[in-house]
Each structure stands twice: as structure tokens, then as C-alpha cells.
Amino acid sequence: TVLAKVTDDILLVGTDSAIASFIQNIRASFDVGRLQYHTNMTFNGAFISVGPLGFTLDIIEPLARLRPIPIAYARRLNPHDHITPEELTALRSLAGSLNYIGQAACPPATYVASAIQQFIGRTSNVSILLQANAMLKELQKLPSVIHFPLADIRDSFRVVALSDASFAPSSRYGQTGFLLWLQPFAEPSPAAATTVASPSYLLDWSSSKQRRIANSSLGAEILAASLADDN
């Protein structure tokens, strides 16, 4: 029997009986029994409640903690003025917080974070701060409770990718995003073309600036579809 370890990976080579004995020893030492998911909890500021049909994620607290960037009234009247180092730091902090929330449980926050990050590292003015505050305000109006139903492992599933993009005629680098869903596979029917399989399970999502230029709205959409297909 040979046991090799590289960083956080373990490779075990041996006879079937030796590997079975190794697995039994590991289970005897570290098995904590069958996990019971009947307790509500708070994780990274999000409240998680578990029920017989799945679990619910409430992210209202993390979103409510975010505050708009302070802007003096006189500066609001001059949106083309350059932002101060303190305002740039606040802008970066807001983008980072939104990106964290978005990656954890809120796809719309991912889009807002990506949109704000595009203005960081270049000459920015007060209008960027006003736009960031406006996007944050609209984001906080969205439903903050997300339900994740339990999947029946006896079903057959398919992965469905949804993509979208916005064309940027000035820079030619559009904003793109995609959602990856796990849906129960159903036999084709006349109604299948107009309905979405339910329940559906959101697996992954992303929103970012396109890495390639597009000369038209159609080109931006094709790049978005290609990105969704790659993932």
C-alpha cells in the first residue's frame, strides 16, 4: 500500500482489502454520525433556515449594513469634479462588499459590484459615486430571501445556461453575465417551449466586463453565450 500526499490531496494505492480497511479506520476516527439539518443558523451575516422542502437564505442583514458613499451637497452639484482619495477608498470598499455578498448568494449584487469595479483605477468623477449610490439603493429594494429546494436524486437533470450582455459602444467592452441552472429533465412537449422546468436549482453565476471587444450588440450577446457555454 502506498500513501502519497501533495498539498491538500491524498493518493492511496493498494489492494481492495487494504483500501477498504483504510476507509474503515478513517470513518471510525472522524465519523460524526448522520447530520441533522433542523437548526436555523447565521453564517457570514446571512440567516439560514432549514425546512423539509429545502432551505431559505435571508441576506437582508448584509445588504442593510451597506451604506451609500457620503457626498457633500456642494459636490453633488458638480458631478464632473474628480473624486478624493477618501471617496475612492469608499468606492472600493463598497464594490468589495457587494462582490462578497454577490458571490455568496445574490447574483444582482455581483452585477453591481462588477459595474462599480470598472470605474476603479481610472480617472473617476463624482457622477460615478452618484451612480454607485443609486445602484445600491435599487439593489436594497430587491427581495432578499432566496429559497433553495431540495433535489430529488432519482430525477434526471440537465444543466441550462442563461446569458445576457449589454453593448458598450464607446469602449467596445460590454458587460456580460450568466446563470447556470440544474433543471429536471422532462420529455419534450408542446408546452415545454413556453414553460420553465420547476423546481430549478441555481448552481453558479457571474457578471464581469467582457475580455474581448464587440462591434455590435449581437457580437456582445454571442460573447456572453460563449462564456456561459465554457462554464
Give the residues covered by each predicted segment.
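Long, low-complexity, charge-biased intrinsically disordered regions
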Residues: 1-231
